Amino acid sequence: MGDLEENKRMVVEYYELAFNEHKPEEAVEKYLGSEYIQHNPQAPDGPEAFIAFVKAFPEMSVDIRRVIAEGDLVVTHGVVKFTADDRGTVAVDFFRLEDGKVVEHWDVLQPWPEESANPHPMF
């Protein structure tokens, strides 16, 4: 299961390295398990598929605003931008860790709306 703070640190570093530093191969080598189960219906399983996804969006960036950990799960809440001028997509990602590696991923994505029915910010 590992230390919760260490698990949180690892997941944040994994996303920083992959999406903000644009080094998906290094991120996979350091943080991803050899078996990587993907629950997003638009993304295939496996480390190679993750690398291909990141490379398909060379301007992509992730701004993680919250990180929560419990047991072998880490949850992030943040903003994904696929291009520099993208308005952004709010993302909630769940990661399952095993033996210090990310082995499973779920996500829920919501485009950042131009208008809101209430005065509350997304974060």
Give the label of every model feature segment.
Residues 1-123:
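C-terminal and inter-domain tail/linker signature
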